[in-house]
Amino acid sequence: MPKTPLLGITEGDPAGIGPEITVQAIHNMADDRSFIPIVYGDPAIISRACSVTGLSETVRRVTSEEHIEPESNVINVVDTGTVPHADSIEWGSVQELAGRAAIASIEAATDAALSGKTDGVVTSPINKEAIWKTGSEFLGHTEMLGSLCGTPDTDTMFVVSGLKIFFATRHMSLREAVDSIRRDLIDHEIHKALRALKVFGCNSPKLAVAALNPHAGEGGHFGTEEIEVLRPAVKSACAEGHNVVGPVPADSVFHKGVIREYDGVLSLYHDQGHIASKTLDFDGTVSVTAGLPILRTSVDHGTAFDIAGQGAASPMTMQSALHVASDFARFVPVIREEYLPSTGRN
């Protein structure tokens, strides 16, 4: 019988809702025997989160991932030693100490997954400004994890309603994103997406490339990127034997993906894919980082400083991230073989 996956959960920015949704998700999923949770962070912060959410869970400081078993009303925490006193962190504001705590949590959880002590990492939201206050220059989780794992060429993959959504560009202005739509980029992103689809269980994946312009450019009347860049890239991938279609108008491509015409969609810029996924299922959208030698899933929302500390945040996205991680844990051997720098094909 396969062993139950041990999933490491980061506490996120302790000034935000990360600790709250973490403890609530663990509480709500206590009867879910498909995974065992372990939190990386500060016990004082996790205890405070239990208090503001009205939970009576015992927060247990542990020093090792060994012999962790599911236990009712107990949250096991590997102490990263950054915030010994919860009142050092003020709810709902950008603080350097909170940034340092978030980084320490990510580093500890990543190290545990890399060494095989856990089967995956599930990340709570962080605040980029707090991270930058520490002197870090990472744009976010994905870049930090890529650096820690030695695999900087990662790919964000949203899992929503059975569809996998990829991004050719992400954290840049819309103007920069449009200027970035070049043949070399699209060729590269198509192959990365196809590779990820195979790693995550699609043996013969069908990928759609979203169009950039209205009506896929309407024969060049509304833009020429489809003619000059996207269509040639799709044609080249097909010539290599891949099942790639497009460019498909963006107002229909995601719907077609949900009804299983495609396994994945390559969106061209941040909001093109985000708007689609969050409209399809706001609480059920889960971010997966493909290209890492570890399994990493994440909630797809921010720290919500405006409601932090009130016990008002919904844990549904964290529960979705845990559910996807427990399901995808079966792919961990393939993930390591494919993406580990010393053995993979990066």
From Swiss-Prot:
Positions contributing to substrate binding: 141-142, 278, 296
Q: Give the UniProt keywords, A-Z.
A: Carbohydrate metabolism, Metal-binding, NAD, Oxidoreductase
Any binding details for the cofactor? Binds 1 divalent metal cation per subunit.
Kind of enzyme, top EC level?
oxidoreductase
Q: Where does a divalent metal cation bind?
A: 171, 215, 270
State the protein's purpose. Answer: Catalyzes the NAD-dependent oxidation and subsequent decarboxylation of D-threonate 4-phosphate to produce dihydroxyacetone phosphate (DHAP).
**Protein's recorded name:** Putative D-threonate 4-phosphate dehydrogenase
- Species in which this protein is naturally found: Cutibacterium acnes (strain DSM 16379 / KPA171202)
Q: State the organism's lineage.
A: Bacteria, Bacillati, Actinomycetota, Actinomycetes, Propionibacteriales
